[in-house]
Curated annotation (Swiss-Prot):
A divalent metal cation binds at D9, H11, H44. It catalyses: 4-CDP-2-C-methyl-D-erythritol 2-phosphate = 2-C-methyl-D-erythritol 2,4-cyclic diphosphate + CMP. This is 2-C-methyl-D-erythritol 2,4-cyclodiphosphate synthase. Keywords: Isoprene biosynthesis, Lyase, Metal-binding. InterPro entries: MECDP_synthase, MECDP_synthase_CS, MECDP_synthase_sf. Involved in the biosynthesis of isopentenyl diphosphate (IPP) and dimethylallyl diphosphate (DMAPP), two major building blocks of isoprenoid compounds. Catalyzes the conversion of 4-diphosphocytidyl-2-C-methyl-D-erythritol 2-phosphate (CDP-ME2P) to 2-C-methyl-D-erythritol 2,4-cyclodiphosphate (ME-CPP) with a corresponding release of cytidine 5-monophosphate (CMP). Belongs to the IspF family. It comes from Halorhodospira halophila (strain DSM 244 / SL1). GO terms for molecular function: 2-C-methyl-D-erythritol 2,4-cyclodiphosphate synthase activity; metal ion binding. GO terms for biological process: isopentenyl diphosphate biosynthetic process, methylerythritol 4-phosphate pathway; terpenoid biosynthetic process.
Amino acid sequence: MIRIGQGFDVHRFAGKGEGFRLGGVAVPYHKRLEAHSDGDVLLHAITDGLLGACGMGDIGRHFPDDDPRWRDADSIGLLASTLRLAAEAGWVPVNVDGTVIAQAPKLAPYIGAMRQATADAMELSPGAVNVKATTSERLGFTGRGEGIAAMAVVLVESAPGRG
């Protein structure tokens, strides 16, 4: 059996900083992202999509932003925890397609590293992970440079021998 899930996340820029994490990669920028965890919107969207595909709710249910355990949490760790939950329920990821929406900074130089970091974290081949970046043509909060959004689609299948 196969299932598909979609995920979404957004974080606002908050003051000066040295950059942020995106897809498990450090992206230099003159602003930082406001977040309870490390604020990696792409990995949060992927985690949310994985939970959805497995019928396990959403990222906020598993890692609530008012829980001090998740303060400054590494999003790769959150994804790893979610992958364990999925495996325990009999699901394995097959592929991921993520889109980051940001007016700035330009993300093209980091896409390859994001694909590789995500593939490594999910134990997938890089060919099973796609990451795209786009702008919103200066419309909305991302277009005004107030934050970054990401969405992801995750395909899972029943683990061998489970269905």
